[in-house]
Amino acid sequence: MTQDIWTSVDSYIVEMLLPADDVLDAAVRAADEAGLPSIQVSPPQGKFLHMLAKVQRARRILEIGTLGGYSTIWLARALPADGTLITMEIDRRHAEVARSNIERAGLSAKVSVLNGDAHDLLASLEKETGEAFDMTFIDADKASIPFYFESAMRMSRAGSLILIDNVVREGAVIDAASEDASVRGVRELNEMIARDARVSATVLQTVGVKGYDGLAIALVN
């Protein structure tokens, strides 16, 4: 199988199952025009996140890594009327684009975009948060995902979902000798989860327009 096939199948899935969406298209276009990297989740992946949040009946969602707000919009649309989503983004320009996209989507009342280092933002949020998050989506620097996961665990409850994107690294995750910080972060996370009796977890390998990677899904016991 080749990237061309993966991309073509993604296009087929979008054509068959994902109706045209002016708001999401505008979000991608605004991010591109602002020079943001085109590393947001694909439309089928965004729909998958949306469906998981619906199945979860999530009322509180935490997202670590906003980029231009594309996945944020997918997730926030799954929230009930009284739902809230907190998303964290280290890059000020990315956060500004995300806020604009979220406002265009009519979701500003439900979504808070926090701009800053997630290490600091999470530490503050842990002190402030009284109610657990029903779902957390981690799509930020992979070297730090063990820290992000532990913080998310402290703000979760039994039945909460924690999802971590880009955990296969085009297969590099199996290289125990890798010196790549992202690969090392993912491997450390996997080892942590494997030892952690608080969660049940798996990894789904993914292919598509975004290439070959994977999504970790952890259910808090």
Task: Please give the residue ranges for each predicted region.
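N-terminal auxiliary segments of SAM/dcSAM-dependent transferases
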Residues: 1-24, 34
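Beta-strand-loop-alpha "switch" segments that mediate conformational coupling across diverse proteins
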Residues: 27
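S-adenosylmethionine/decaboxylated-SAM
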Residues: 39, 43-221
